[in-house]
Structure formats: structure tokens, C-alpha cells
Amino acid sequence: MSDFAIGLLISLSRRIIDNHNYIKKNKWLRSTLELNQSLTNKKVGIVGMGKIGKSFAKKARALYLDIFYYGPNKKKINYKYYKDLKKMAKEVNFLVITCKGGDKTNGIIDQSIINSLRKDSYIINISRGSVINENALLKALQNNKIKGAALDVFNNEPNINPKFKKLKNVILSPHHASGTKETRYEMAKLSCKNVFNFFNNTKPVHKISWPWNY
């Protein structure tokens, strides 16, 4: 999943989809493309430094990005830790959300966090749609309060807010960050392990909640 987030980050900053559409619409030499920005020395704030967050950070560091992170606890890693999410949001060019869904993170990216972001910043979400206040995000994108967003997850999937589809500064993906053969194989193994543990009166590898909070 972390490589998918890296792909979204590069696509946003270097406007790869815009470049693709520029060619398809036969605009080459007829108009100029807006200059985009290099990733070197840009600041990335990761919300949730778990397995996915750590994997993303390692890959992002290889691109010479400066890494910051927010979470409930400081970890023994060589990245700057923020206990205050709002303070981190004010500093970064990219806010990348990799935390778990659930009650503890529901709406964690609220209007105050979004309003704290720089005008040239981006939001990338491969976590759960429930972690973001979608109305606040939509308003920020519509009014160019932030530069853009890349979203792989949404509230009320697959019936996402149709207003997102009309925006030019957002990349949309159908909850497919885990869509590799390798990842799905590991997910299947984990599911089997959970079922095995359940029927053997052993604690599941991960807690399963119902209904799913996406």
C-alpha cells in the first residue's frame, strides 16, 4: 500500500494525470502547462506511523523528502514526532494519512486541521474515509484553500459525494491501494489465521468490528 501512496504523491506534485490529458486533448504546442514542483526537500507529515506509515516513510526518504509524523505515541525512529496534529499540519507540504480506521481516528482530519494546512499543500488518504471530514475537505478543494488531494478511500463507498468528481485538483481511486497480488495474498493469510484462532478459542490476530467503519 505504501508504494501506491508514493505514486499518488508523485502524481500530485508532478501533475502526471494532467500531462497525460494534455497529450490526449492535442494541446501540445497549442498551450503551455503550468510548472509543477520538485519533491526534493519537501516536508511530508504522516498520520499514523504503523507498518504502512513506516514503509511509506522509508520510500519517501529515498526521494529526499523530510519526514514528520503524528500518532498517539513517539516511536524509536529517526523522524520528527508531533504530538499536536495541528502543528504538524502547518509545517508540511503533504499530509499523508495511513492510520487505522475506527472510533479513535474518526474525523481526526477535521476542518481545523484542514484549515491549518498551507495553501500549497496536498492531502493523501489511503486509510479510511471516516478519518476525514469530507465536507470540510471538499470546501477547501473547491475554494483552493489547499493545492489538491489524492483519495483512495471515502465515506459511503462506493457512493461517494459526486462533487469530488467535478474537481480538477483531486485524484480519485476506488479503494485499491491494497490491490496487488502480494498484498491480497497476505490479507487472505491473515483472514485464515483469524478464523483458525477463533475456532481454537485463541485471540484473533486483529480485532474485527462490525459493522465495518470505512
Task: Identify the residue ranges that each predicted region occupies.
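Rossmann-like adenosine-cofactor binding region
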Residues: 73-163
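Phosphate-binding beta-alpha-beta segment of Rossmann-like dinucleotide-binding domains, i.e.
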Residues: 1-43, 55
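N-terminal Rossmann-fold NAD(P) dinucleotide-binding loop
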Residues: 53-54, 110
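C-terminal helix-to-coil terminal segments
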Residues: 1-4, 18, 35, 157-214
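Gly/Ala-rich phosphate-binding loop of Rossmann-like dinucleotide-binding domains
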Residues: 57, 61, 141, 165
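Residues at the starts of beta-strands that form the adenosine-phosphate
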Residues: 43, 57, 62-66
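Glycine-rich Rossmann-fold phosphate-binding loop(s) that bind the pyrophosphate
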Residues: 49-50
